[in-house]
Amino acid sequence: MFISDPTDSLITPLPDLTAHSEAQSRNLGIPDWLKQIEADIATALEKGVDIRHLVEARAASIDSLLIELFKLHELTQTDLALFAVGGYGRGELSPYSDVDILILSPDTLSAEISQKVDGFVARLWDVGIEPGIAVRTIEDCLQVATDITVATNLLEARLLIGNDSLSAIPNNVVQQTWSQKEFYDAKMAEARARHLLHNGTEYNLEPDIKKSPGGLRDIHTIGWITKRYFRITKLYDLVPQDFLTEKEFDELMFAEGFLWRIRHHLHHLTGRNENKLLFDYQRDIAERMGYEQSEEDEPNAAVENFMRDYYRCAMQISTLSEMLTSHYYETLIEARLPESERPEKSVLNARFNRVGDHIAIAHHHVFAQHPEAILEMFLLMGQHGIKHIRTRTLRALKIAARGIDQHYRDNPLHKKLFLDNLKEQNYLFHRLRIMKRYGVLANYMPQFVNLIGLMQYDLFHRYTVDAHILLLIRMLHRFTSPKYQDDFALVGSIYKRIERKEIIVLAAIFHDIAKGRGGDHSELGERDAIEFCLSHGMSEADAKLIGWLTRYHLLMSMTAQKQDISDPEVVTKFANLVGNVTHLNHLYVLTVADMNATNPQLWNSWRASLMKQLYTQTRRILRADLDAPTNRQEMIATTRQQALTMLDKVDNQHMNREEVLALWDELGDEYFLREIPEAIMWHTEAILNHPPIGRASDANSEPLIVLREHRELALDAVQIFIYTQDQANLFAVTMAVFDQMNLDVLDARIITATRDFALDSYVLLDRHGTLLTDPESREELTRRLIDAFKNPETPKLVQKRLPRRLKNFQVPTTIDFNYNEASRQHVMSLTTLDQPGLLARIGQVFLNEGIEVHAARITTLGERAEDMFYISDIGDNMLSDAKLERLRTTLIDVLTPSC
């Protein structure tokens, strides 16, 4: 039977299969017809034809083809029945969707009928259908239906042609094999597993529009569990059953239509059954969907607007799916359980009850009669450790949230309840997540509306702004959890001592509140934060602190990652901006949480150690610690004394204090300013224990190269110390060797001793994790470096292709120079696209231009590399403006990816 008559649409009808030439005897001209169908659908899609019509029309066209071929192979003269199953059974086919069919027989096929079936199947392949086919008896179905995937396919079986008496068999098999609760439990387990494979979030950078949370599968799941009980054929049938409201149905259909349009464009764009919205496709799909990019817009405005609508759509589907599947359980499964198996019910107050681990309104009119109960409910959840809300209450909440207006926001009781919610830390992330999903947060804080689904088209910002803010608040909770104590020991101890945690929670909410408005979001957010806090009765001091945290929430991370925090002047300047220890403690906690909630893959122990170092150094200054050094010479003396104390505890016959001090006198002041005592200790041991290196005056000595695990880093992070005669191409050849061995540089400290020996320290990320465990890998790296140092010719660079993901981003190369009077060096700040061999290519340019590198700070933020180099000419002289401009031009030319 047809879903609809394809001739009534814009789709070309199936030609007469009996009127074909000899040359077409196998494919009957059908491949050309299938191509025409896809062209018709593409044209109709461009014209804005209702996507639902196109989905159903393609299924109807395939229906007509299969029916005619079934007849052509004389299968209508048998007891067989032909069913469409799966998505095709629902009557939903995108251009390259799977065409799954079931040929059902009452009994085992005879040889003659089996031969006809084989011919039918072969014909389908010949014409280009590539179907998924199952040929089964009723008994076969009963056996395989114990598999939930097979059972789901059978549940959606739709008879196309054949033995009409078999039409109800697939559905009956499912009913017979699976109880209502078993089927529900299996589908929920399946959904949880699917979501887990996609990071359990709707906000993946490259979402699978079918299987990710909030994808088409979540809508299908609603249909599957309800079809098992109600035996419906379409979702709208749930409305008369009072399971689904008209508005909920409309919301689901709108969201489904949006995803179908994306899926159709994806299939047309890729020419295959592609459901992953990769970066490669997002710009093209945005354009095809009508998202325009004007010259006045930001470079990524169109694609960001498109993805914002996708994320909002996914959140809507996910919210409805969670609510409706829970509603199914509560009303159709739990309600039928014996009293002893139902969740225990208790009274919280006159307005709310506790039902197991859920909260529920006491009667239908709670929110209408007591508007403050909207916020009271969330406070009760925190106070009583309740994580979930009953679905009847959620539906009432969704309606009530629409009534939150300016009058509601101005009510002093409501303001108090909102702040009380932020003070109550128990389940705060979960409570705010529900507030967001059901409209409470956006209606109470109108600024939040624009943040929902707002994304930044890059690899650094892993989540949408609204998701990021809530994840930041979840990170704050983790700082107090024993489970994460080892990961966040220092920040956790600080956060636990902060009594008024709502200060940081409010800073978390407001730190990105102004994104997407244009202008400096930190400054705009500061004004919003102060206004909100004062309007909610908070003190001026609290409001200013929250405003300050909002404005300067990036200060600490940028200082730690992009400046040389071994320079006392850098730390002192930062300390002056921070002002006091209270500001520092709050900023440190907020910054660590912010970085983790931005992109957990970019948070590593190296960044953690930078943050810790900046915090501890700044805290000493702000506390006016009498034992803390106050100038360069005092810092040098303190560092040397601490390192010497460590060395005195080392039992090593190759070292004595006189040897150590003699060596140190040759290393220069800069070394003791930039290295920590522990590093100086192991460097000194390495140098004095490896003759004939001994002293910098030994001109013929072999280079010393020592590797070890970084004490504050994960196992795949490696420290490498290089002590050798300085030479013009040292940085360039070192970077080239690291690149050849696929080692990423996290940090570089490049120091020249007073007698022209280099003391270079690098922190490397070993992608393969073999440097510390495999002696051959260590020997190979050491050998390559020594060979490169001995052969001063231009290092050979390895040509590498730009990774797929990076091809979709445009990061213009920008270079700024500042002269540092104290060090008499130029500080070169470079921003460019992170790309294979980046540092090696920069090093080669430095070599060719006669540039000496004294220090480097390497920072990678998603697809962006933001690096700093302290440079001079080979003679340590100031570079001329002309040379700086030539260096800038050359680097931009070298680092701009070719098309």
Swiss-Prot record:
Record field: catalytic activity: [protein-PII]-L-tyrosine + UTP = [protein-PII]-uridylyl-L-tyrosine + diphosphate; [protein-PII]-uridylyl-L-tyrosine + H2O = [protein-PII]-L-tyrosine + UMP + H(+)
Function: Modifies, by uridylylation and deuridylylation, the PII regulatory proteins (GlnB and homologs), in response to the nitrogen status of the cell that GlnD senses through the glutamine level. Under low glutamine levels, catalyzes the conversion of the PII proteins and UTP to PII-UMP and PPi, while under higher glutamine levels, GlnD hydrolyzes PII-UMP to PII and UMP (deuridylylation). Thus, controls uridylylation state and activity of the PII proteins, and plays an important role in the regulation of nitrogen assimilation and metabolism.
One family name in Pfam for this protein: NTP_transf_2
Domain notes: Has four distinct domains: an N-terminal nucleotidyltransferase (NT) domain responsible for UTase activity, a central HD domain that encodes UR activity, and two C-terminal ACT domains that seem to have a role in glutamine sensing.
Region annotation Uridylyltransferase: where it falls in the sequence: 1-347
Protein name, per record: Bifunctional uridylyltransferase/uridylyl-removing enzyme
Annotated ACT domain residues: 719-804, 827-899
InterPro entries per the UniProt record, alphabetical: ACT-like_dom_sf (IPR045865), ACT_dom (IPR002912), HD/PDEase_dom (IPR003607), HD_domain (IPR006674), NT_sf (IPR043519), PII_UdlTrfase/GS_AdlTrfase (IPR013546), Polymerase_NTP_transf_dom (IPR002934), UTase/UR (IPR010043)
CC cofactor: Mg(2+)
Uridylyl-removing, as annotated region: 348-718
Enzyme Commission number(s) of this protein: 2.7.7.59, 3.1.4.-
Activity control: Uridylyltransferase (UTase) activity is inhibited by glutamine, while glutamine activates uridylyl-removing (UR) activity.
Entry similarity comment: Belongs to the GlnD family.
Listed PANTHER family: BIFUNCTIONAL URIDYLYLTRANSFERASE/URIDYLYL-REMOVING ENZYME (PTHR47320), BIFUNCTIONAL URIDYLYLTRANSFERASE_URIDYLYL-REMOVING ENZYME (PTHR47320:SF1)
GO biological process terms on file: regulation of nitrogen utilization
All residue ranges annotated as the HD domain in the record: 465-581
GO molecular function, one term: phosphoric diester hydrolase activity
Originating organism: Psychrobacter sp. (strain PRwf-1)
SMART domains: HDc
NCBIfam families reported for this sequence: UTase_glnD
Gene3D superfamilies: Hypothetical protein af1432 (1.10.3210.10)
Lineage, top ranks: Bacteria, Pseudomonadati, Pseudomonadota, Gammaproteobacteria, Moraxellales
Keywords assigned: Hydrolase, Magnesium, Multifunctional enzyme, Nucleotidyltransferase, Repeat, Transferase
